[in-house]
Amino acid sequence: QVMVSTVGIVPGIDRLAAENVPLTLAISLHAPDDDTRSAIVPTGRKFKVADILAAARRYQAAAGRPVNIEYTMLAGVNDSDAQARLLAQLLAADRMHVNLIPYNWIGPGVSGRVYQRPTDERMRRFAEILTAGGVVAHFRRTRGDDIEGACGQLRETVATGRQ
């Protein structure tokens, strides 16, 4: 089983659909709206959320496989009830699965902002809204954060020279 992950490069998604390679596509969306996404995803300004999801739908139609939407949850940034409702509206008619990923602290983000992980209760509430809206949502288990070895943390340690 092969999975290809992308930040949502629309021409690349369309190329995968045309090539009909049997794989699972994961799209790192992280926000249901363009303003929030462009603030937290460096390439977020290049492709609009609507265009990314349209490409994901084209991929699903061509491949006959659901697309995974990756959504790293950042406290006070992309974890509100309103954002959950908007994401549910955008995905309700699709078979896409949403993987909710708790943020692993790695230092300041691309904008210099320091992000925090939402509480477990906030994450549960977000998932409940998605589920009530007809969207399949799963929590991605995180491991290694107690030793700064979880997703993203090793890269930050190497990049900054921290030991």
Please provide the spans of the model-predicted regions.
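C-terminal interaction modules of eukaryotic adaptor/scaffold proteins
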Residues: V136
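Radical SAM enzyme core and accessory elements
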Residues: A132, T142-Q163
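A structural preference for short, hydrophobic beta-strand core positions in alpha/beta folds
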Residues: L100, F139-R141
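Conserved AdoMet/S-adenosylmethionine-binding subsite of the radical SAM
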Residues: Q1-G133
